[in-house]
Amino acid sequence: MPDVVVVGAGVIGAACAEALSAAGVDVTVIDRGTPAGGTTASGEGNVLVSDKEPGPELTLAIASRREFGVVLARLPEQVADVEWEAKGGLVVAKGEPEPLEKFAKTQREAGVDARVISPADAFELEPLLTRAVTTAVYYPDDAQVQPVLLATALLAAVRARGGEVRAGVTAIAVRQKDGRVTGVETEAGVIECDAVVNACGPWAGSFGTAAGGPIEILPRRGMILVTAPLPECVRHKVYDADYVGAVGSGDADLQTSTVVESTRAGTVLIGSSRERIGFDDAVKVHVLRELARKAVGIFPFLADVPVMRTYGGFRPYAPDHLPVIGPDPRVPGLWHATGHEGAGIGLAPATGRLLTELFIGVPPHLDPSPFRVDRPAVVGVS
């Protein structure tokens, strides 16, 4: 019998399972689909400290960036290449320089390496950048990883330590006895365990309800354009200053801002959009046009580059824009790890470590209280 069943084999569930198994916990991971086949597969692979205002999420991001080295070193050699690139990030403004420079100052005070540079220096870093740039901030700690490779490598590490990963298994409910979790009910039968981790991403609210611990997690749709392969033309993760505001916004309406990055395969990824429209997965042409228009405003050469495909996905959004990490006091033995919205790839290592520290009872490496399950925004307490 496993000690813990993790429900959800995306990058957050995989990171939790990997950290738990590294601490000696017997883990089984289940997913109704294929590992990394949901939200994780629709991610860009952002590992960012640059897009977060000072506060708990930035603290988690800084810790997670450091934790990546530890986690990657634990991966089995045959799956260790997850296309990790510590390429750095470049945030640019085309209007008044002061807001971006002021934002960078607050980040530096919070421990982020945020370097204000001149337009000329920005053009040195990115020769094809628009000459309309008025100021820029360089973030050497921003990085990129291939999300599906990362999640599957983390799950491979779990298997290597004796854990189990079961695809195509749908969790229905959590079984309890004498006020504690005793197992997970699935369509394939009951899996007995001492604890359950709800890592269902945008579906975590539904599973939380089924498990007896409802939480307010909503889907937020995002779309990405993918160009045809090109010679290296974008060297860093580049985005406009509006991206920071869009990331932190709770607005349900469509928001778009520009983030452009190349991949090892030579394609260029163009985002990003945010929209709360439930689980409507229809391709919205007007969203794609807006992404393309804004990307050309940052990199004019993209106007002549063909788009090979587009994809989108649903990100788990919490109303106060903070992840939910930790035990559910209403259901002893039920844990949650969700609500990271579009930052889950980058926040996964620290999330897995924090949940594991709380689970095994060692002092956590950062303050877990901002992410607790029983906060008003998550459980609806007024």
Regions found by a protein language model. Give the residues of each.
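Glycine-rich FAD pyrophosphate-binding loop
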Residues: A22-A41
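N-terminal Rossmann-like FAD-binding beta1-loop-alpha1 element of flavoenzymes
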Residues: D3-T28
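Short beta-strand to alpha-helix junction loop
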Residues: T59, V91-P99, V137-A156, A282-V287, ...
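Short hydrophobic core segments
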Residues: V5-V7, I191-W203, F207, G352
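Active-site substrate-recognition segment that forms the wall
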Residues: E18-A19, G45-N46, A80-E85, P202-P329
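Dinucleotide-binding Rossmann-like beta1-alpha1 core, especially the glycine-rich loop
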Residues: G45-L125, A295-V296
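Helical element adjacent to the flavin cofactor pocket in flavoenzyme catalytic cores
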Residues: V137-D194
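C-terminal catalytic lobe of FAD-dependent flavoproteins
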Residues: P147, D280-A282, H286-S382
